[in-house]
Amino acid sequence: MLKKRIKYSALMMNLLMLSTPVLISVVEVAANEQQSVNEENAHVNIGGMSTMEEVPRTSEDMDTEEGNDPMMKESENEKTKKQSEEANEEWKGVVFGESTSASRYAIEPLEDGVRLSSTNNGGKIQSSGSDGMTYYYQAIPKDINFRMRATIEIESWTYTNAQEGFALMVRDAVPKDHLFGQAFYSNSFAILGSRIEYVWDSDRQEVVNTSGSKYTMRLGLGTRAITGISSEDPQAAPAPGSVSVETTPLETSARFLEKETGSYNIFGNGHGNLFPATNSITKLDVEMKKTNTGLEAYYYDPETGEEMASDIMYDWEKLYASDESVIYAGFAAARNMTIKVEGIEVAYSDPATDPPGQERPTRLIDPIYTVTSSNHSGNQDHTMSFRANADGLLTIKNKATGEVLKNAKDLAITTNREFDYQTKLMEGTNEFTFSFTPDKNYPPEEYVEMTSYETKEILHIVDYRKPKYSTVYVTPEGSDAGNGSRQNPLSLTQALRYAYAGQTIVMAPGTYSFERGLTIPKGVNGTRENPIQLIAEKNPENKRPVLDFKGTGNGMTLFSHYWGLRGFDITNSAAMQKGLQISGNHNLIEEIHAYRNGNTGIQISGSSNDPFEAWPAHNLVKNCTSFENADPGFEDADGFAAKLTIGEGNVFDGCIAYHNADDGWDLFAKNETGSIGKVIIKNSVAYRNGWVPGIEGEGNGNGFKMGGSSLTGPHELINSLSFENLAKGIDSNSGTDIIVNSSTSFNNGSYNVALYTSSAGNTDYHASGILSFRTENLEMREQIRPLNQNEDQIYHSLNYYWNEREKQSENTLGHTVSKDWIESLNTCSKEGQQPVTRYENGSIHVHGLMQIKPGNRQTEKERVDGLPLSVGAIFDGETSPSSEYPEYAIVQEPN
């Protein structure tokens, strides 16, 4: 998709708008004829009172070029009028997409517009092409040009996770009926008020795609083009990687105010935990036009009419490729957004007599070539990594000698794919020259070029130091100049820079404060036989090291492989920043406490620029606890997550998630990046997620959220307990093939068990040993909706689902679960103690909660007064005993 920001003068605007006669269609619905919204109907139809008026022409509008003789205008006007009369001038309203429902929207016709609401987290703005929204639109024939203009007033909105929004949107598909809670995909071009990101180059004074000041507007204003979606089946998810998304900012007040890189907001009338404001826009004038040039988007000052910004989608044909004879244009609201659209004007014109299209410009891509590996190493065998945003050839030289390194001449580089090169370092400073020449035929698409095809050289320096001791001691007061002995401790940052395979870094108890993030970069790797250990010093008081990011740092990120992290706390990362992100492979994360961070406590995820095989894999998160993590909107901060970009073999064992703003666990996947690797969660507990004590706000509040976007992902939940979460206990979240074994769900606010999908045609759920039980909300059913699968995989004698009619837990044989069989139904905490703790060996202790008494464990199939051992989670003190603590000996230097 090729677009370019274009600013028009007032004269040019007049020429574009008035060089041919246009007809204005204004929606006029009298107050006493406003139609009520009927959720049983497919659409809200508002029509029958539109008027057609010809725009008065002045002498300045006359065009005497050949083919535009004024004497010919009458016949041309008649043709245009006929085309516009063929347009469907009836305004319609429809609600569709993920998170929408019959109780979460409103469409209120006004005298010359409409009020649109999407409430209670209904709908969401997404980059996958499957927005969930309330949409008010007209169908317009594809063979005529048009313009649509209106004033949008933002009456109220509540921030959650930047999926709120409003739009003036052109789409190539709209469902015929309301499609509540089901994905519906469409190519589109929109003026969008939602999450918009941009990078500003202060020297060039323009938005760039290279380095600069990055601003994340939560919310901002821009255009968004989504293409690559097949029109054959809008309810079917597109193939991963097939969807293209491009955004361009239309409002850049953050850069005018010279704000620091970060997250901001530009809209007023907002509620919730808002980001700092760089503007307070509550009303804006917007226009969308289809001309012979393309789809043109304009943003005007609503008071003066001055054009503030504009954008053009030149490859508009991508929205006109469907078999339908019409395109859809209108206004939208999503997720906690209420807007009033007034002064709607729609005009039509004939492409044959409209001004010819402008020449399509070439979009230029700035080169971004980067060595992504560390500048420090404690390993003589060192991995250097390189990435470029173009195909080309790379040569690596020793700068001191000018010699090409072994097998390092003309290495083929693929755009946005990391390339690794192994080398041996010399003690001290090692200087390398990376020379990259982009392919002159890149990129392989029309109207796009690199700004330079010249060879670029990058000087990369690696400082190699072998630490004095194999076990180094670090303290909060440690020095970069320390040697790692008890008498002369190192700083933590210095110890991490020069860590090497087999080394142990021992952290003294105390608070380690950071104003910025703490990163273990790529290339600082252990091995399978000799991992690098970062562990807490054992002490009689059981005091722990605490990494405190002061509300400004980005948390801790682990990019490397074969590390062991153990026994310390991570807290207070900045808003929207995770506590710990694991982006490497084969790491063991054990006994880490992540709490009160600005986003998810502990998350496994990689980069969408990397292929699946480069995503983090084979990581074990064991006996960790994550609690009271909260993002500003209460929509992102989970206890644990393994989502979006993860490979195979990631496991959570013996972990506890409670009082996190969003979910306990989140295994979300989206269509842009496709399915993720299988994740196993076992011997774990999720409870009371969705709210944080002492902080206003509520999130999604699911215990174990096991999928997303109707994508396959056979994630498995084993021997785990979910209770008193704000919403669902065990949630497939549209994942099509999750597996649940020997797990318990108790007294959750919504469904205890939810196995469903929103857009896939088939499911393949497997469940065995589910115990769903309630003492509250007895009328709450389960949400189990298998599609075209063997239902015996879900319904059989080893699953006890909640029967809301009989108000009991029962299996397919009619056997029920008695309260008397359960050791404890009490979730009340003792003062100063959570209802879930740990045994001395690290295993989870639930204090009898939802544990079947030994005498009621069925050992013979004939008995009906008990449950088989495989039904429900069992926490007997031996579920996840801690691994052996690494041995260490801190060096004591002589006085």
Name these PLM-found stretches.
Residues 47, 52, 60-62, 67-362:
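Extracellular glycan-recognition regions
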Residues 159, 515-518, 544, 549-558, ...:
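Short glycine/acidic-rich loop motifs that flank beta-strands on beta-rich extracellular proteins
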Residues 341, 507, 534, 563-567, ...:
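All-beta strand scaffolds that present successive hydrophobic residues in beta-strands
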Residues 360, 749, 759-895:
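Acidic, glycine- and Ser/Thr-rich low-complexity intrinsically disordered tracts
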Residues 448-494, 511:
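Right-handed parallel beta-helix/beta-solenoid
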Residues 472-476, 493-514, 531-539:
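Glycine-rich repeat segments that build the extracellular carbohydrate-interaction surface of secreted
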Residues 475, 508, 521, 535-537, ...:
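Feature marks extracellular polysaccharide-active and adherence modules
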Residues 487, 525-578, 630:
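Right-handed parallel beta-helix/beta-spiral solenoid domain characteristic of secreted/periplasmic
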